[in-house]
């Protein structure tokens, strides 16, 4: 395997000159740079990435923090973020905070020690102060972590109104909506507020089912939806995240109810699971690939110390029609 010294001998320059080219530091004439690059190609020289990162005081690694990688939304988001970061020259380190209780703090410590170059976080187990006291590149998804930490989110208010109008247009008058724990504030809370407001303005009854905090596993979703459908046999509509809508539909069919005749459903997120069931579920879709691009782009700009003129990036949601509502499909 060729070394820097081999490249230097081939190009008839000193090792320090080769190092300056590799690290893009200091002056090297264009003619000398071309000679060194030609020598590297001829010798099939591969730079030591670790050494180069240490020189620049960078690791080339980004930590991605999510509550659960088994949750369809976060699984798709992680996949897309990894792709976007790789295109920008970064490797990723994944943290599932549901399984590792102290990991959120540990990853912040790693950022402080320059083990990772930045963090993209979709969790908030820690106090906001733990984030705001760190002057390092951090970008948040759907979590308000202070005015200095950029936030990427969708227009949840619009999503809530869309869902309500879909169920109202389908004739719903008595609906259930599933929402996160009220003890934890999130930008997504507004979708439930708007959903309830629009439904009640149209004389529909809304029952909100509060979910346990930080539970994203299928077993819990199955249990809570079966219990809800058992306790509310007369509801005619459901609004909830993808998996919740899927399990509600499963429970309703087991009860002998017809979809969408007896029960209409609107899911929120629009991941693959809403298309993988029969009938396909009408969904409010978060644009995961675009969200991932914004998260990766913002973090890359912060690492490169570029200005961030817009601290909050708001993205639109859309409707994907399935066969669980009545109307356009």
Feature roles, as predicted:
Residues 174, 206-208, 259-264:
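Short acidic capping loops at alpha-helix termini that bridge into adjacent secondary structure
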Residues 2, 60-165, 227-234:
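Alpha-helical recognition/docking segments in bacterial nutrient-uptake
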Residues 108, 116-122, 176-179, 232-243, ...:
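Periplasmic-binding protein-like
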């Amino acid at each position: 395997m060729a070394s820097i010294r081999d490249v230097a001998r081939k190009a008839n320059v000193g090792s320090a000159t080769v190092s300056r080219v590799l690290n893009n530091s200091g002056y090297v004439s264009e003619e000398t740079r071309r000679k060194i690059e030609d020598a590297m190609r001829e010798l099939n020289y591969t730079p030591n990435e670790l050494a180069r990162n240490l020189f620049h005081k960078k690791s080339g690694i980004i930590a991605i923090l999510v509550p659960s990688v088994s949750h369809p939304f976060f699984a798709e988001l992680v996949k897309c973020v990894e792709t976007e970061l790789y295109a920008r020259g970064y490797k990723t380190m994944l943290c599932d905070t549901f399984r590792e209780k102290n990991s959120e703090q540990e990853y912040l410590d790693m950022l402080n020690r320059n083990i990772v170059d930045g963090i993209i976080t979709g969790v908030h187990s820690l106090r906001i102060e733990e984030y705001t006291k760190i002057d390092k590149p951090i970008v948040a998804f759907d979590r308000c972590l202070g005015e200095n930490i950029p936030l990427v989110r969708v227009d949840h208010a619009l999503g809530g109104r869309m869902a309500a109008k879909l169920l109202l247009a389908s004739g719903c008058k008595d609906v259930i909506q599933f929402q996160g724990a009220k003890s934890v504030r999130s930008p997504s809370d507004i979708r439930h507020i708007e959903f309830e407001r629009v439904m009640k303005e149209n004389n529909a009854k809304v029952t909100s089912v509060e979910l346990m905090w930080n539970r994203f596993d299928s077993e819990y979703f199955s249990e809570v939806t079966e219990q809800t459908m058992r306790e509310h046999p007369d509801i005619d509509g459901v609004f909830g995240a993808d998996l919740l809508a899927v399990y509600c539909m499963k429970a309703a069919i087991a009860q002998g109810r017809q979809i969408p005749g007896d029960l209409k459903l609107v899911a929120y997120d629009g991941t693959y699971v809403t298309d993988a069931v029969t009938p396909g579920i009408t969904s409010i879709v978060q644009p995961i690939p675009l969200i991932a691009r914004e998260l990766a782009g913002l973090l890359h700009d912060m690492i490169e110390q570029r200005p961030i003129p817009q601290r909050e990036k708001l993205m639109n949601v859309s409707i994907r029609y399935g066969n669980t509502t009545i109307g356009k499909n």
